[in-house]
Curated annotation (Swiss-Prot):
Subunit details: Homodimer.
The protein, known as: 1-deoxy-D-xylulose-5-phosphate synthase
EC top class named in words: transferase
Reactions it catalyzes: D-glyceraldehyde 3-phosphate + pyruvate + H(+) = 1-deoxy-D-xylulose 5-phosphate + CO2
Chain sites annotated for binding thiamine diphosphate: 80, 121-123, 153-154, 181, 290, 371
Cofactor(s) required for function per UniProt: Mg(2+); thiamine diphosphate
Entry annotated with the keyword Magnesium: yes
Co-factor note (free text): Binds 1 Mg(2+) ion per subunit. Binds 1 thiamine pyrophosphate per subunit.
Native organism: Haemophilus influenzae (strain PittEE)
Stated role: Catalyzes the acyloin condensation reaction between C atoms 2 and 3 of pyruvate and glyceraldehyde 3-phosphate to yield 1-deoxy-D-xylulose-5-phosphate (DXP).
Pathway field: Metabolic intermediate biosynthesis; 1-deoxy-D-xylulose 5-phosphate biosynthesis; 1-deoxy-D-xylulose 5-phosphate from D-glyceraldehyde 3-phosphate and pyruvate: step 1/1
Pfam families: DXP_synthase_N (PF13292), Transket_pyr (PF02779), Transketolase_C (PF02780)
Enzyme Commission numbers on file: 2.2.1.7
Gene behind this protein: dxs
Family: Belongs to the transketolase family. DXPS subfamily.
Length: 625
């Protein structure tokens, strides 16, 4: 895919921010228009994150126009909004490869460009990292500026406020920009508000403010009175948020129109020269400039390939996803039990909870991007006699590890974790792979860990976790289910596996949705196949029987080999004194890069062909079959 650059006369001249800074200010509106159109054309042909980037076009242009990037350091939080940044920093021609194998990364990535200061993927890290970068720059004394751009969702996380609190105390020179795209431009974002913001960000006001503070430091009562007067003025003229950020030690400016390129350039030019921590609050519209995305910013957050003229996204008529299987199960339970509570850390759509949130609003909690809080909130509900279900992506559960141990497991509370996107997730790459959850949960006492091989098993395991009265986790992958028949719900025997096929010499112990590959291979190799179901407690009796009756055991999982389910089998064999040869197949000891799920599994040797080759090579090394 290549865009016709004849349609983008100004953008075609921009191969770096240095080129951008050669333009006249009056050319910037046209550049923004071309950049927005180019982004739409590119993403519609490749898939990717669209609505967020459409909303940050003017901000991106203004930042690279005013700041001397990469000398000045620009940090994007998460990175969904950073596509325009990639286009302006020398990667325009590579946008056709974004989120693809060997292509450019979906998020800012240090190894990809000197303009990507921080590699990101998870939210709310920008201010903490930015503060560290700003402190380092301050010690270099080279005049380097630091800017962090964070969204209104990401700033709700505790980590962001921890960083704001620290930055305000240190008084380090840095600028935090809040990209607030929750609502359309509000009434107080207009000419008067922009004028006031320019006054408060200007050098005269800053000089008077700093000079007055030095004088009034010697007269505390007057100093306190003037401080409160300034905060009151800002609260009246700007927004209630100003008082909060001023109390944290920041000079707050805003909210201002994030789509007015002239005002943004003027504002940032003023703020670049201010000392101490600065906070600029801009209002933007997610999906700006493309009507379908403005109307449905959630639907156009991440999109497949689509027709930009009609704006219609392709419908998925295939088998239901595991996320939908979970959502349907949760609704089914809520119909019978008013005490079941669904909790999500800002992933309602992705986790399949839209219908549940609409049908059972009193049993639904979206706690925002606050994974730690989500888990301990569930702890409190469990103590109160309710049955909390935390729906969370595997990669995000990492952020609540202490709460999982300290608040849930130690107290042995009945909290069910529905762990979505376990294993290979595909195009979002290393930051989003669900590679570690088995490993980091398996060592926690009191945990029950289940690995369904299909959607019916997934439902039964969710029901088992809901009924068991202990901390329990069910991990399932991104994507469509297998298509098996759903059976009535019943509680599975805890810690027991199921024998699928009986063979000779080779036994494949499957954990999760790679079972179809195991079954296909079993016909070729005349292998026994056991669906282990439980990683913890693991079926020790079955493992010992298989070790006694087979020459080779093979474990199969979409989790890191180190500390994973295969390691649990190895521990059983060791403690039982069994010397049966064991091959552990799973994810290797490196971060898995972006690719489709199928490409990644093939590259890792975890597709059917790769598994067969690994088994045969292992047997060859051990001796003849």
């Amino acid at each position: 895919m290549t865009n016709n650059m004849n349609n983008y006369p100004l953008l075609s001249l921009i191969n770096s921010p240095e080129d951008l800074r050669l333009l006249n200010k009056d050319q910037l509106p046209q550049l923004c228009q071309e950049l927005r159109a180019y982004l739409l054309e590119s993403v519609s042909q490749t898939s990717g994150h669209l609505a967020s980037g459409l909303g940050t076009v003017e901000l991106t242009v203004a930042l690279h126009y005013v700041y001397k990037t990469p000398f000045d350091q620009l940090i994007w939080d998460v990175g969904h909004q950073a596509y325009p940044h990639k286009i302006l920093t020398g990667r325009r021609e590579q946008m056709s490869t974004i989120r693809q194998k060997d292509g450019i990364h979906p998020f800012p990535w240090r190894e990809e460009s000197e303009f990507d200061v921080l590699s990101v993927g998870h939210s709310s890290t920008s201010i903490s990292a930015g503060l560290g970068i700003a402190v380092a720059a301050e010690r270099e004394n080279a005049g380097r500026k630091t800017v962090c751009v964070i969204g209104d969702g990401a700033i709700t996380a505790g980590m962001a406020f921890e960083a704001l609190n620290h930055a305000g105390a240190l008084h380090t020179d840095m600028l935090v920009i809040l990209n607030d795209n929750e609502m359309s431009i509000s009434e107080n974002v207009g000419a008067l508000n922009n004028h006031l913001a320019r006054i408060f960000s200007g050098s005269l006001y800053s000089t008077l403010r700093d000079g007055s503070k030095k004088i009034l430091d010697k007269v505390p009562p007057i100093k306190n009175f003037m401080k409160k007067t300034e905060e009151h003025m800002k609260g009246v003229m700007f927004s209630p948020e100003s008082t909060l950020f001023e109390e944290l030690g920041f000079n707050y400016i805003g909210p201002v129109d994030g789509h007015n390129i002239d005002e943004l350039v003027a504002m940032l030019t003023n703020m670049r020269n201010l000392k101490g921590p600065q906070f600029l609050h801009i209002k933007t519209k997610k999906g700006k400039g493309y009507a379908p995305a403005e109307k449905d910013p959630i639907g156009f957050h991440g999109v497949p390939k689509f027709d930009p003229i009609s704006g219609e996204l392709p419908k998925n008529n295939s088998k239901p996803t595991y996320s939908k299987i979970f959502g349907d199960w949760l609704c089914e339970m809520a119909e019978k039990d008013a005490k079941i509570i669904g909790i999500t850390p800002a992933m309602r759509e992705g986790s399949g909870m839209v219908e549940f949130s609409q049908r059972f609003p009193k049993q639904y909690f979206d706690v925002a991007i606050a994974e730690q809080h989500a888990v301990t909130f569930a702890t409190g509900l469990a103590i109160g006699g309710y049955k909390p279900v935390v729906a969370i992506y595997s990669t995000f559960l990492q952020r609540a590890y202490d709460q999982l141990i300290h608040d849930v497991a130690i107290q042995n509370l009945p909290v069910l974790f529905a762990i979505d996107r376990a294993g290979i997730v595909g195009a979002d790459g290393a930051t989003h792979q669900g590679a570690f959850d088995i490993s980091f949960m398996r060592c926690i006492p009191n945990m029950i860990i289940m690995t369904p091989s299909d959607e019916n098993e997934c439902r039964q395991m969710l029901y088992t976790g809901y009924q068991c009265g202990k901390p329990a986790a069910v991990r399932y992958p991104r994507g469509n289910a297998v298509g098996v028949k759903l059976t009535p719900l019943e509680m599975l025997p805890i810690g027991k596996s199921r024998l699928i096929r009986k063979g000779q010499k080779i036994a494949i112990l499957n954990f999760g949705t790679l079972l179809p590959s195991a079954l296909e291979l079993s016909e070729k190799l005349n292998a026994t196949v056991v669906d282990m179901r439980f990683v913890k407690p693991i079926d020790i009796e079955m493992i010992n029987v298989l070790a006694q009756t087979h020459d080779y055991l093979v474990t199969l999982e979409e989790n890191a080999i180190q500390g994973g389910a295969g390691s649990a089998v190895a521990e059983v064999l060791n403690s039982s004194g069994k010397s049966t040869a064991l091959l552990q197949l799973g994810l290797p000891d490196y971060f898995i890069p972006q690719a489709t799920q199928q490409e990644a599994l093939a590259d890792l040797g975890l597709d059917t062909k790769g598994i067969e080759e690994k088994i045969l090579n292992f047997i060859a090394k051990q001796g003849n079959l």
